[in-house]
Structure formats: C-alpha cells, structure tokens
Amino acid sequence: KWVGLVYQRMTLISDGGDAPISSLSGQLSPAEVNMDLTMCGLLVDRAEELAQLYADKGNWNDVKEIWFDERLSNRSTRGSSQKIYRVLTSRFKNAPTSLPNPSVLPRVFDQCDTSRDKAQILYLYLVSDDSLVRYVVHEYSARVSRGEPDPLDFSNETLSTILGNLTYSDGSSFDYAESTTERWCEGIRSVMREIGVLEGQQTVVGDSPSVGTIPLLVA
C-alpha cells in the first residue's frame, strides 16, 4: 500500500487524507543502500524485453542465457550487460506481491498508451527495490505534503542535502564520493524525466505529472 501512497504524494493525487509517510532515515542499514541507479535508470525498452522473455520462458535462467547471447551478438560488452541485467532483474525479482508479477507485465504494457505510462509502472518496481531511491522519494513526498516551495526540486544542491541527511540504523551516515553522488543525482533526474515529473534535459524543478490510467491501476 505504501508504494501507491508514495506515488500519489509524488504526483499530487488525492489520497484521502492518509497520515504522512515517515522518513526512512535511521531505519536502513548500510548494506541495504547502493548506487545501482548510477548504472541504469528505468531503461523502459530493455525492461520490457526482459519481462517479455520471462513471460515466454517462465524462469530467469533461460532469460539470462538468451539475454547475454543477444547482447554479445550485438557486440555489447559482457560487463555492461551483466550490470544492467542484475539491476533490472533485481527490480522484478524483489517486487512486492502488490505489483504485477513480471510474467504478466507484457500484457500490462500492451494496455499502455505511451512509453511514459510504461515508465510510470517501472518506477514502482524501482522504488520497491532500491532503498536509496525509496528514501529520497519519501523525503520528496514529505516536501509535497508540507507544502514547501518548489517541493520537487531535483537540483544537485537539494538532492545532496537530502542524501546528506540520511543516517543508517547503526548510526553511521551516507558517505559516497562526490562524483558518484553526482552521477546518482543525474540518474534520479533521468527517472523523473521519464515519468513526467521533469520536462526537458536542463530542467531540475518539476511539477506533478499526469499519470496514465494503467499506471494508476497498478499503483
């Protein structure tokens, strides 16, 4: 249920007055947090391809074999393909039961009108799987709920402040190299562009996007 609430808050959809979503700061362990978003964003086309393979084959071992055979025949590097495969399949494998099983996603995608609709659905899998993205989305949801000016400001400055406020359950703090953090910030902006929060490559302050009918049903 919280996934739907987060999506509602981020997109300013009325949620019937539910209690504010609490911060995840202090609740996550360092082991739960990673920078996978620096490797790949939503990658709608590739995620759709993986979901179709899984729907066809029914198991991830066959999907992996076919995926790498096709990548290598297209002269992709194995290292790059492995990273993308690991990150994208993790989002599917760790999805809560409240989201569609990846085996039925191709049918869900067939009902989508636009690539943005598909991105808005894949965003839910990302938020469910990636603890750092989830923490940041919770913080932005709180900014929207509090009525802050420019609540959806995804500038490096605002993002860095939010990331810097993250403390782990063991008392330690978020601590990554500045260059890595900047790549992560660009990654989250890329996601926000794909789901319609940010418009244009240079825009860093967003607005509530229109949400497609199918993404709303999924959320």
Kindly label every feature range from the protein language model:
Residues 148:
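Acyl-donor binding region in acyl/amide transferases
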Residues 154-171:
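DNA-recognition alpha helix
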Residues 179, 193, 197-219:
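Accessory, usually C-terminal, subdomains that scaffold auxiliary metal cofactors
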Residues 11-132, 136-139, 145, 154:
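Eukaryotic partner-binding/assembly regions in large regulatory complexes
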Residues 80, 178-191:
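Short amphipathic alpha-helical interaction segments
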Residues 170-178:
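Surface-exposed cleft-lining segments at the edges of enzyme active sites
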